[in-house]
Amino acid sequence: MDSIINFAHRGASAACPENTMAAFARSLELGATGIETDVQLTRDGRLVLIHDETLSRTTNGSGWVKDHDLEELRKLDAGSWFHPDFAEERLPLLEELLELVQDTGTVVNIELKNTKVPYAGLEEKVIDMVRSYNLSERIVISSFNHYSLRLCKQLAPEIRTGILYMEGLYEPWEYARSVEADALHAYHFAVLPEFVAGAKAAGKVYHPWTVNEEEEMRRLIDAGAAGIITDYPDKLAALLSASVRS
């Protein structure tokens, strides 16, 4: 069996506040071989890691990410909503995550959050940052904005891309070919063994999301997924270890 990438969804987000350095570091301790994160642009053009386009769910701030400078965002508490022990956590920058994983072999799945907010120049900034760390071979750029992914592939053919989608896409590997994407980041219920086989024949792979139940993890391992995105990298690591032993 080929090695399956164990992607920690927003870091180890079941154990730590999502998309924080604590979550990213903890995911590596729990056996993750990949980290999934979300990137947006601050008002002054910095690459900040946060899922929501607004601040209120995961910080003590309010309003839109795009309307704040980095200096303002760095003052926010990005951890107390999860647990008081994480009150010192701040919104991280993409370069901080890349520095963390640079010498680890970890694959990083960077989701471009550019559907609700069409951040001008986001693709170029992410690609430039990845290249500055010489990590192109260990990056997958994903998005629900497939125009953006096509642009990424045109700008950086060496960086893998993955189309994010829910379900119901007919022969998604053929669609992925049309936008030159390498991977299918499907909602996990949309992944069946025959789909994985079809994708493999077309040179595409599946990285389903977000898979937290062990039974579903086993199903996707057996189906041939190349990577699995989960809030529980420790659970997945244990199952993958058992699969190798058997």
Annotate each PLM feature:
Residues 1-246:
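Phosphate-group recognition and catalysis centered on beta-loop-alpha active-site segments
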